[in-house]
Amino acid sequence: MQTLTYDFPAGQAAPNAVHVGVVASGDLEILLEPPPSGATDSSASVRVRTSVDGFDTVWHDVLERFFTHTSLAGRWELNDFGATPGVVTLRLRQAAEAALGGQP
């Protein structure tokens, strides 16, 4: 089990808490908590817990690409059980859409 942490600049606070996906083979769970009210830090703090070691660069690249286009501030928790980069991107987009109340 490996834990990775990242911080990305974010332009908008996530308005809602979100839970998408499940921790199952080839999938991952994402928990998103909005920043505390009154917080001045506008960053996306990401913690990845993964069952697959050695993919630090891949995780960084996938997350950087996502947060470049979707900069939602908050605490992101990703619990991975071997998801491919495509599944990770899908779940991240689902979480962002749910946090914004269905608005892309």
Residue locations for each model-derived region?
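N-terminal intrinsically disordered, cationic/polar leader segments
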Residues: 1-104
